[in-house]
Amino acid sequence: MNKKKKYVHTKQFNSHDCGLACISSILKFHNLNYGIDFLLDLIGDKEGYSLRDLIVIFKKMGIKTRPLELQENKTFEALKQIKLPCIALLEGEEYGHYITIYEIRNNYLLVSDPDKDKITKIKKEDFESKFTNFILEIDKESIPEKEKDQKKHSYFFKDILFRNKLIVFVILLTSLFVVGLAVAGSFYIKFLVDLIIPRSLRESLITITLIFISMVLIRCIFDFVRSYLIIKLSYKVDKEMSNVYFNKVTKLPINFFENREDGEVISRFNDGIYIKDFFSANFVTAIIDIILILGLGVILYRTNNILFLTIILPILLLSCLAILFFDHLKKKNQKLMEDKAKSTSLLINFLKNMTTVYSLNKTSFFLEKFHLTYDKQLNSTFSVAKAVISNEILKGLIQNSFTIIILWVGTRQVLNDSMSLGTLLFINTLAAFLLSSLDRILSMQSDLQQAHVASIRFFDVVNYPVQQDSNENLTELDFIQNIKTVNLNIGADPMRYIVEDINLILDRKDKVLIIGESGTGKSTFAKSLSKLYKVPDKSIYLNGLDINRYDHLSIRKRIVYIDENPFLFKGTIKENLCMGEIFDQNEIENACIMSQCHEFICNLDKQYSYKLSENGSNLSTGQKQRLALARAILHQPQVLILDESLSNIDPDNTKLIYETLHRMDCLIILITHNDPSNFKYNKKLVFRNNRIIESSYSENKEYSI
């Protein structure tokens, strides 16, 4: 008998992305862990999504769908014939409201409504009153298999635990010794009250005291070993998470970064600290505390069952309190992390552009925007703190009240000679241990919620689908003879392509000029040639072979794209030019001579060992652009694409660089807004309205046309 699949619920981010949430639920139901973030990149952020938009998203993933309009008054007869789960369109705002139907039962439907917090039931009559009669049926057979690199949260951490099982075992063992010795120490007061004092055993007092002091010393040694190993495990978890995260970041498509603020990517990584802390410390502590609660429970039951039952009551009350606050804290922590990401993004954006802020005298605007955003973060922090404090106060009320009640019940038994005073003090100590362990577990609630929300945000990046080069038949690109595009269309929305119907042939020694206004698709076309964007099959050919048949890393070695914002990091000029590759000094200097930056480098202190600041802020923009060009030339591309990358270089140096480009034995593509007078090209392409509206060609490569 097949195991029944668990129904998946995805909550919408905003009021208009219910359709994306429904798609995500269906994909996750079929073991494809794709969230709303990924789906947004497929279609773009809109104010609402039509049924056609949903069909387009499924189509982009290779999944077949069938839109249906059901007859009125025959809704449920028709629904019984449809493959579930499916997406239903209900009446709502402009684009309506989407829900996922999982089951149809006698009087109700089991659905995932993205506006709700979980899977819900909807009565048939309520459904019919809102139903628009439109259904989107999904062909299960066309749904692809689960991506190999997708990691479930639990599997990821189980794998870490398995690889560090010896450390985890020793941590658990030493923790048990620490707890056991701490509990054993409680017998000291029982011995004093019931044995030593009544019988005046002065000599035994010294012996027993030394034994218990030795136990304290041994406990401290075990505690040190335990703490050291927890730090070591934390280090390994941190290293594993950072490796997984940044290895994935380096494989993400370019539109992932274009559609997100810098602070969002950084904050998701920083959120990992909540996961690491909970996993490495709280997780182990929770296991020990659970063992301690069970062990002490047995001891208390065998010692005095009446007091045991008295202690059970606060445990039940505290557990109920934790359940009541669980969802409440989850929502507040999620809001807090989102607000932190927005504050970080805004701060990074302004700090990177303080020159503009100062030059326009807009510091007051910056402060106003920052305080407005940061105040939202502070309000979220305050809201979380209030919820945590309320929880702690109620826990304290229960614990302190029952501490008195336990002593009251125990004292009555001592007065009735049902129990000795030493036993009461011993039980009270054990009860304090038990309630303290329970308190630690329940206090993890906020940490657990933070770790849970952080793991969702963290694994949204880790599980983001990337361009896979798993095909064994992929070809290594060694040499580019020509590039051909056939009906090339690039864009998320088929109704509004960014680049549309591009047909051309470029040869190895061509010098190509592309001009056009901003937003006409020039950069998108250029990035597609180097496969920075996903390219449709049979639309770009390199040497007559589909670009998707080549390994994309080898493509980017041969085709180098440079934009107008040169990337320079904190380090020497030589380090920035080589970026991990090994070149001899002559090669480096020749590349710099070709890009007209050798002279100004020689005038710098330490020349090629001159230290650049972050983003090369101690150089002019024109100098940075020349360094970026030198780096590209140094890596010997066969196709060099310059997208406004010479825009800030002075005219004299620009003219010399154009002459160098003309002599280079490779395909040059220069993208500008205007026709440069000094650039010698043999092909010219004019972009307008996302198409090439004009192309001209000259056999004579020595002169501009």
Curated annotation (Swiss-Prot):
It comes from the Bacteria. Residues 483-705 form the ABC transporter domain. ATP binds at G516, E517, S518, G519, T520, G521, K522, S523. Its main location: membrane. One of its GO terms (biological process) is transmembrane transport. It is a multi-pass membrane protein. GO terms for cellular component: plasma membrane. PROSITE patterns: ABC_TM1F, ABC_TRANSPORTER_2, PEPTIDASE_C39. SUPFAM superfamilies: ABC transporter transmembrane region, P-loop containing nucleoside triphosphate hydrolases. It is found in: Cell membrane. Residues 168-450 form the ABC transmembrane type-1 domain. Homodimer. SunT (TC 3.A.1.112.4) is required for production of the lantibiotic sublancin-168, probably by both processing the signal peptide and exporting the resulting mature lantibiotic. This is SPbeta prophage-derived sublancin-168-processing and transport ATP-binding protein SunT.
